[in-house]
Regions:
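A cross-kingdom feature that marks ATP-driven nucleic-acid transaction machinery
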Residues: 1-27, 33-46, 50, 70, ...
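Conserved P-loop NTPase "ATPase switch" module shared by AAA+ and STAND
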Residues: 69-85
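Catalytic P-loop NTPase motifs of RecA-like helicase/translocase cores
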Residues: 54-56, 81-83, 111-112
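A short beta-strand-to-loop transition that corresponds to the Sensor-1 phosphate-sensing loop
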Residues: 105-109, 115, 123, 130-132, ...
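Conserved catalytic/switch belt of AAA+ P-loop NTPases
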Residues: 86-104, 108-110, 117-119
Length: 408
C-alpha cells in the first residue's frame, strides 16, 4: 500500500509551530490519522486512540490521569469519544504547553468545533480534511484555492493531469477515499459497503441510540439520489417512509458527520428575490455512485444523475482546494424567484466569481448570461467560468473562461 501525500501536510507542520493544540476534523476514513502518523515518524510523539474501550473509559472517568499517562507531544485519535479531555488540555495549554503538544482528530465536526470553541477558544487551530482531491490523486498535490486569474490558471495546468470525459467519470465513480485509492482495499464495492456499515454501526448509532439501521441506510441512499439538488426534506422522508421531523434530524446527522454538505444560496440586501433553500452534496462522489447503484463509470456517465453527480464532484473539488489550504471558503449558489440560476458563486477578495457546471465538451457561450444578475448586488463581480468536460482551457472574453473540470 502506497502512502498518498496530502496537500495539508505542510500546513499542519506550520500550524504546529504556532499552536499548542491542533484539532483535525473530517469524515470517517479520509486519512486524518494516517497523515498525522506519517508526519510524526521519528519525532517521539506517541499516539493513543479512543477507539480502544479501555483508553476511552479512562479518558472519560479521569481525564487528568489519562493526560499524565500520555504526555505531550501526543496524538489523540477519535477525541469526540471523550469530550471531558478538552478542559484538561486547556489547563495544560494555559500552563505553557509547547507548540505542537496536542494533535487531536475526530469525525463529528460540529460537536468537536463546539467543544473546541467552548474550552479551547484561541488556544487551538481547527483544520478540516476531506477525501483525496484531484491534485493529490492526479497531480502533485500543491495547488492553491481555485483562482480565476489567468496567470494562476496557466500555472495550475502544470500541477494537474488532463483527462477526457470517460476518464472524468472514472474519477467520479472511484471517489477519493484513501483506503480504496491507495490500493489497501482493491474492491471498490466491498470497501464502500463496509464503510456504510461501519458508519451506521458506530457514528450514527452513537448520535441516535436505537436507530433503525436498515431504515437509515435507505435514507442515505435516498439522499444520494438527490445530489446537486435543492434540498426537499419532505420528498426524502416520503421515499423512506419516515416523518419530516425524523428526516430533518437524520439530515443533521449526515451533515454533522460530514457525509453531506450544503451550498447556501447567495443573497444580500440588494438581491431580495433569492431563494432560501440550500443545495445538498456528498463529500465523496464514489460513495454517492455506490449508493445509487451505478456498477461502472460508463453506466454512470450515461445515467440519470450524470449531470448532478458531475456538479457534485466539481463543487466538492473546489471546496477541497480551500480546505486543503486551511482557509475559510465562502461558497454559494445563486437562484432567484425569476428562475435566474448560477451553479456556484465563490466569494473571495471582495469579489463574486460565478461558475456554471455543464456535462459538455463544447458548452454554449450563452450559459454565462446569467452571471450578469450578480451586477445588481453590492459586491462587485469578478471573473467567472463555465466548468465542463473540455480538455483544454478557453475563454469567452477576458472575464469569462471555459475551464476543464480536471483543472480544479
Amino acid at each position: 500500500m502506497a502512502y498518498i501525500h496530502r496537500t495539508l501536510e505542510q500546513k499542519i507542520i506550520d500550524i504546529s509551530r504556532d499552536y499548542s493544540c491542533l484539532l483535525l476534523i473530517g469524515p470517517r476514513q479520509v486519512g486524518k490519522t494516517t497523515m498525522l502518523e506519517h508526519l510524526m515518524e521519528g519525532s517521539g510523539r506517541q499516539k493513543v486512540t479512543l477507539d480502544d474501550v479501555e483508553n476511552r473509559r479512562l479518558a472519560q472517568s479521569d481525564p487528568a490521569l489519562f493526560l499524565e499517562m500520555h504526555p505531550a507531544p501526543v496524538l489523540i485519535d477519535e477525541v469526540q469519544y471523550a469530550p471531558q479531555l478538552f478542559s484538561y488540555i486547556k489547563i495544560n495549554v494555559d500552563n505553557g504547553a509547547a507548540p505542537g503538544s496536542y494533535w487531536l482528530t475526530g469525525s463529528q465536526a460540529f460537536q468537536l468545533m463546539e467543544l473546541a470553541q467552548e474550552s479551547l477558544a484561541g488556544r487551538t487551530a481547527i483544520v478540516h480534511m476531506s477525501a483525496l482531491s484531484q491534485s493529490e490523486l492526479y497531480g502533485d498535490g500543491t495547488t492553491e484555492p481555485l483562482s480565476l486569474k489567468l496567470e494562476k490558471l496557466n500555472r495550475r495546468k502544470e500541477h494537474l493531469s488532463s483527462c477526457n470525459s470517460m476518464e472524468m467519470f472514472e474519477r467520479i465513480w472511484n471517489g477519493g477515499m484513501p483506503g480504496h485509492r491507495s490500493g489497501r482495499y482493491t474492491d471498490r464495492d466491498v470497501f464502500y459497503s463496509s464503510y456504510i456499515q461501519t458508519y451506521i454501526n458506530r457514528d450514527v448509532s452513537d448520535m441516535i441510540p436505537g436507530v433503525d439501521k436498515l431504515l437509515f441506510a435507505d435514507f442515505i441512499r435516498a439522499a444520494a439520489c438527490r445530489v446537486g439538488q435543492m434540498l426537499n426534506t419532505h420528498d426524502i422522508a416520503q421515499d423512506v417512509g419516515v416523518s419530516d421531523d425524523t428526516a430533518k434530524r437524520w439530515l443533521q446527522v449526515l451533515e454533522k458527520s460530514e457525509v453531506i454538505f450544503y451550498l447556501r444560496p447567495y443573497s444580500n440586501n440588494l438581491l431580495k428575490r433569492t431563494v432560501k433553500t440550500p443545495k445538498m452534496y456528498f463529500f465523496d462522489t464514489g460513495l454517492a455512485a455506490y449508493l445509487t447503484k451505478y456498477s461502472n463509470p460508463e453506466i454512470l456517465m450515461n445515467g440519470a444523475i450524470n449531470g448532478a453527480i458531475l456538479e457534485n464532484y466539481t463543487v466538492a473539488e473546489i471546496r477541497k482546494t480551500w480546505l486543503n489550504s486551511a482557509k475559510e471558503c465562502l461558497l454559494h449558489y445563486y437562484r432567484d424567484k425569476d428562475t435566474n440560476e448560477i451553479d456556484m458563486v465563490i466569494e473571495a477578495d471582495g469579489e463574486l466569481h460565478p461558475l456554471e457546471i455543464k456535462k459538455s465538451t463544447n458548452p454554449g457561450t450563452e450559459l454565462a448570461s446569467a452571471f450578469k444578475v450578480l451586477d445588481k448586488g453590492s459586491v462587485p463581480r469578478g471573473a467567472g467560468a463555465i466548468l465542463c468536460l473540455r480538455e483544454e482551457i478557453s475563454a469567452i472574453d477576458r472575464n469569462t473562461f471555459i475551464l476543464p473540470i480536471w483543472m480544479i
